[in-house]
């Protein structure tokens, strides 16, 4: 199977959420981070036919998908091929072979997420505003290689939606305030900046459920993120 630029981008994003990954037959490829706070469902269909051509794999687990992505990015016109016990990334005269791992040894989603029918709000969030939030948190609150400090409090007052970036759940000393548009709903929820940084660069439709769950739907790709919200009661 040849890897398109879109598939390359989606795999890179999946790798950023969790290095454990399970290729699955069908168009829905999912990943969940180790704290269970963000779940990604991407529309990528892989040809799971084994190299022998005699059968099709149902799933193929990889312990560290970041290595596979690095292999893909190092080759021109790369392809992925599956065999019973390994996955190959092929480009020209080069073949990189990665051993498969049983799903029992991987941190991967065990079920799909059903978003609640009842939602408190629905609004659009641009890629530029997400980038603005992330850059502010990095600059003002600091970050490590694996964690970005900060939270985003999103409030609708029946007229406008505003986002406030702050260092902690309760502390709001140094803050960034951004107007996100108009609304006729009243709501209030908080998400971590560390989860926002895992979203693919895109504009989003955001929906919030009072069951402490947000859905971020990409506007240009068939990709959805489910993000847990912080307890601010």
Model regions and ranges:
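DNA polymerase processivity clamps
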Residues: 1-99, 118-233
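Long, charge-dense
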Residues: 103-123
């Amino acid at each position: 199977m040849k890897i398109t630029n879109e598939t390359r981008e989606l795999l890179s994003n999946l790798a950023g959420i969790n290095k454990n990954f399970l290729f699955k037959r069908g168009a829905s490829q999912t990943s969940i981070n180790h704290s269970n706070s963000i779940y990604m469902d991407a529309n990528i269909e892989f040809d799971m036919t084994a190299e022998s051509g005699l059968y099709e794999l149902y799933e193929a687990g990889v312990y560290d998908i970041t290595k596979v992505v690095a292999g893909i990015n190092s080759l021109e016109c790369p392809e992925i091929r599956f065999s019973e016990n390994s996955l190959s990334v092929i480009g020209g005269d080069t073949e990189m072979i990665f051993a498969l791992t049983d799903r029992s040894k991987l941190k991967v989603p065990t079920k799909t997420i059903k978003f609640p029918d009842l939602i408190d709000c629905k609004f659009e969030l641009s890629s530029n505003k997400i980038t603005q939030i992330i850059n502010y948190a990095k600059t003002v609150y600091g970050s490590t290689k694996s964690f970005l400090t900060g939270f985003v409090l999103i409030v609708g007052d029946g007229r406008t939606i505003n986002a406030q970036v702050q260092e902690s759940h309760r502390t709001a000393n140094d803050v960034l305030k951004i107007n996100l548009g108009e609304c006729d709903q009243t709501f209030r929820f908080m998400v971590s900046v560390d989860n926002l940084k895992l979203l693919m660069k895109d504009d989003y439709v955001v929906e919030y459920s009072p069951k402490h769950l947000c859905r971020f739907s990409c506007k240009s790709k068939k990709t959805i993120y489910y993000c847990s919200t912080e307890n601010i009661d």
